[in-house]
Structure formats: C-alpha cells, structure tokens
C-alpha cells in the first residue's frame, strides 16, 4: 500500500463511519450501486463536480475504501446500505486503485521545486503528477518486474499503464480529487493547463489508455474545461452544478436526511433553522443542504455561517468588480431576494475566460455562491442566493467594496431607517411603495401580507446589519407582532411593526397598544418605536404611522 496505489492511509469516509455514533453520519453508499453498474461500460468515465465542502472528498474516499485492495471493506460497509445490494460482494476490495489528491500532489511538488537536485524529466506539476504515480507503481511488488522489463522511465504514464494492462491483463480504478486544481491555482498558466489536459485526454480516449481502466472518477469544483465550446474530455459523463443529472442526492443532504438528523437527541437545532441557513441548492428538482455547514451547526448547536472559501471569496470580489454593465446592481438585487436569468451556453468552465455577466453567474453557481434552477431552455438558468449562510457571506463582501455606499439601494435603506427614527411616516410609506412596485415583488403575491413584510425587510436589509436582529411573528404581549427589529446594543431603539390590509395605519398602531406587544420588552429597552403600515388594495397606496412609546 502507498499514498497513491491502493492507499491505506487516513481516509475521511472510514473515520466518519467509525465515529457515526457521535457525529452526523448520512449513509450515501447507495452511490456505489450506481458506480458498480458502470464497470467496463461506455459510462465508466464519470466526472462529478460540486462547490467546496459538499462531500466530494468523502465520496472519493468512500469509493477508494470500497474498491481498493488496500482496505478490508467488509467491516467498514457491512452495516451500511450498500451491503444490502446484490453487487456488494462482487466489487468489494477487488481492484488496484490509483487515488490522486491534486492538493497533495501540488504541495509535494512545491517542496520538490525548492530542492537543488531534480529528477530527470520532472520539470513542472504535470511531470510530477506522472512521476508520482509511476514511482509507486515501480515500487509495487506486483508491477515492478513488468515495468522493469519495459524500461519505464520517470514520466510517460500512459505507456506505463498500457504495459501493465497488456502484460498482466489487469485494469485499474482511477480516482482523482480536485482534478481542476491546475485551472484554479494555475489559472494564468495556459501552457501548463494544456499539457495537463492533453495528458488526461490521452489517458482516457477510446483509442488510447481507456482500456487500462474499469472505472475512472474525477471530482472537483469546476466542470471539465471547454476548448472551442467542446469539453476537453468528451468521453466523460459529466455532472456539475449547471447540469447535475441524476446524482444530485449523493452530494449534500436532502430534506429526508435532514429530518432524520434533527430526530437525534443530540441535535439541538431545528429543521426550520437548518433549512433557512443551509438549504436552497435545488439540484435537478432536489432540495440540497450544504453538508459541511449542517454538520458544524449540529455539532455546535448553532446556525451561523460556516462557509469557508477564502480563495473563492477573493474570486467573488474580482467577479463583482468587473466592468460588465449592471453586475453590481444584479449582485445587490440577488442578495435582496431577486432572481437573475442567465445563459451558461458559452461558459468555458474556467476562472479566466469570463466574457460577460452570463459567465460571471455561471462561475458563481459552480463555486456555490449562487443556486440555479432550470428553464425550458437547457442553457438558460435562473440564479438566486440559496440561503442565509451565503447571503451573510455575500453581504459582508459587498460592504467592503469601495462602491458600496454609492449604490442607490444602500442609500434607500439608510433613508428608510432614518425616517423610522425620525417618526417620518410619509417617507416610510413612499419608500415601501417604491419597493412594493418594483420587479422584486411578484404580481401574483402583490396583494398579500407576505409581500408587504418582504418589502420592509428588503428596505431595512442593509441599514440594520450592524445594529439589529429581526424576528417575524414574535410572541409578545397578548399575541404575535408581525415584525420586530431588536437592537444588538442598548443604544438603538426597539422597533415593533404591524401590518394591515385595507384597514388603516391607526388600526395597526392601536393593535400594538391594545395587544400590549411592547410589554415583553419593557425594562429591556428604554426606547421603543412602534410602526403601523397599511396597504389599500383599492387605491394601491401605502400609509404609515409611527410613534415613540414613553
């Protein structure tokens, strides 16, 4: 066993299985039943890409633990779902697996590059990639004599694998994690990228090295690079965030899986909170939750943003500061809850060839900053911010940009909060009416209280970020107040908001008083502002009355 050939070292899937009584564990081993059907078929080349922290590495480790001769998988899988499938024993630990983690290869190459003494023919990352695999194959008791006979050198991975396959009549399983590292970390090195993709094309083309593999599995963040609008590895069946296919349930947590997680006595967070914070990736009609964030929220009993994407955050900053007309406004609108239609038809699946806003949104979907839903045209997608976690990340990033305070939406939000503080009901009514009449509010939902609540929350979104938390339908006094803005620090007033339809703002204010919504907060806050907002379905006018309680 080595680090690449039949690795038996640290395996995140095995560690998770062993700790399943104390950690969140969702059995995704049904995925193995899917891959078992692909063996030695024209579907044996499979690429699945997803954003960071979507379980890609755990899944790759699961494949390795199941197929590799380097593991004793019976004890790992015997109580999991795959053990109930007819194909379970047929493939269990029967294959020589070549497992490549490109992050590890890149790190080792970095150390190699600093050495004075170099290996002949190993000059760049692609050479080192080949050399690392060949070195382990040469050190194997099974393959060493064959490779010695063929006088295999330090590079030439294709001829190495062909020699083994032809002489020993054996096939490998090839698993590559972070396949797209060359396109992300070396995004401006076009020569290295072309050398890398040429190597993979030769390995996996039908008249090349494809016969060396019973199954090949690539995973990463970016879809397979396109050249001249065609996939560079067109023999692969590819499934990504823009075209997820049938593998959506195996990456991320589904609604049913979340329901089981919250049933555990160890789970102290609610299904609704998990949904608000981490769901929203609708992949092929399946609601998907970010699995890494769910696990952290459950283990820490707190739903906050656990998004870890420092390098991709930098990429987001670069993308929203491009000169494409309207991109900043679109990002602000997305954060506020609107949707944007875009085309992914000409996206080249890299981080450099960004030609227009369509490519920006396509890349942001692949990175996980946006969700997308399908339309009748397979290339036309509808982008949206998927959940509170991503919304919080995007808001923090946007607020750091030098153009932030110049945006009309931000000015409007500041003016709305200022008007509430100054008890200026006329201005509040005007701003809410502007939002209500904007494209952000669906005509189908225009005349319901939900849309009015949305208008106020959207209007106050940016101006209340630092000083307020908000609650809807909060139990207070003798009933539930529609909307509460509770100050994080004591210097700001508490804001209670009640809505009416075809009534009056005076009625809304009277309800706050007669139902004594404020009593719950008496003693906590010295200043309480109450806001009554009415909308007339006949006149389409908004009315607002604001008072400060003594």
State what each model feature region is.
Residues 163-168, 465-491:
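Active-site metal-binding core of divalent-cation-utilizing nuclease and nuclease-like domains
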Residues 173, 493-497, 529:
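Structural motif
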């Amino acid at each position: 066993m080595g680090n690449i050939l039949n690795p038996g070292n640290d395996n995140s899937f095995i560690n998770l299985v062993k700790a399943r009584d104390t950690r969140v564990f969702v059995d995704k081993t049904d995925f193995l039943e899917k891959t078992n059907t692909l063996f030695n078929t024209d579907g044996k080349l499979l690429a699945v890409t997803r954003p960071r922290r979507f379980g890609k590495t755990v899944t790759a480790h699961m494949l390795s633990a199941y197929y590799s001769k380097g593991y004793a998988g019976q004890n790992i899988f015997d109580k999991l779902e795959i053990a109930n499938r007819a194909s379970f024993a047929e493939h269990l630990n029967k294959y020589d697996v070549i497992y490549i983690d490109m992050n590890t290869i890149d790190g080792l190459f970095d150390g190699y590059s600093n050495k004075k003494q170099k290996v002949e023919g190993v000059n760049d990352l692609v050479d080192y990639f080949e050399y690392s695999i060949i070195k382990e194959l040469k050190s194997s008791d099974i393959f060493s004599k064959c490779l010695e006979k063929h006088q295999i050198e330090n590079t030439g991975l294709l001829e190495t694998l062909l020699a083994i396959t032809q002489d020993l009549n054996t096939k490998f399983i090839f698993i590559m994690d972070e396949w797209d590292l060359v396109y992300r970390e070396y995004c401006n090195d076009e020569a290295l990228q072309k050398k890398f993709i040429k190597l993979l094309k030769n390995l996996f083309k039908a008249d090349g090295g494809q016969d060396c593999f019973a199954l090949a599995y690539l995973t990463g963040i970016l879809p397979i690079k396109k050249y001249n609008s065609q996939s560079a590895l067109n023999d692969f069946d590819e499934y990504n965030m823009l075209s997820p296919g049938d593998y959506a349930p195996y990456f991320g947590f589904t609604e049913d899986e979340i329901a089981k997680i919250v049933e555990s006595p160890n789970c102290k967070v609610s299904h609704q909170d998990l949904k608000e914070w981490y769901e929203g990736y609708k992949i092929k009609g399946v609601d998907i939750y970010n699995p890494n964030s769910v696990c952290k929220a459950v283990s820490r009993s707190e739903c906050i943003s656990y998004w870890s994407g420092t390098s991709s955050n930098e990429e987001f900053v670069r993308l929203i500061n491009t000169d494409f007309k309207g991109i900043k406004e679109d990002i602000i609108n997305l954060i506020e809850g609107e949707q944007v239609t875009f085309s992914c038809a000409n996206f080249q699946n890299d981080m450099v060839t960004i030609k227009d806003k369509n490519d920006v949104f396509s890349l942001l979907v692949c990175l996980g900053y946006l969700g997308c839903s399908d339309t009748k045209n397979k290339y036309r997608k509808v982008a949206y911010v998927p959940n509170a976690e991503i919304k919080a990340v995007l808001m923090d990033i946007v607020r750091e940009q030098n153009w932030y305070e110049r945006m009309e939406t931000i000015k409007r939000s500041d003016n709305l909060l200022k008007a509430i503080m100054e008890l200026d009901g006329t201005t509040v009514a005007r701003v809410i009416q502007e939002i209500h009449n904007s494209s952000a509010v669906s005509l189908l939902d225009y005349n319901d209280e939900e849309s009015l609540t949305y208008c106020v929350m959207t209007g106050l979104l940016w101006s209340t970020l630092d000083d307020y938390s908000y609650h809807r339908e909060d139990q207070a006094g003798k009933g539930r107040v529609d909307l509460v803005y509770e100050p994080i620090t004591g210097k700001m007033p508490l804001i209670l908001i009640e809505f009416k339809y075809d009534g009056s703002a005076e009625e809304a204010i009277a309800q706050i008083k007669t139902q004594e919504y404020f009593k719950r907060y008496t003693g906590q806050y010295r200043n309480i502002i109450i806001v009554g907002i009415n909308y007339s379905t006949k006149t389409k006018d908004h009315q607002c009355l604001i008072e400060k309680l003594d």
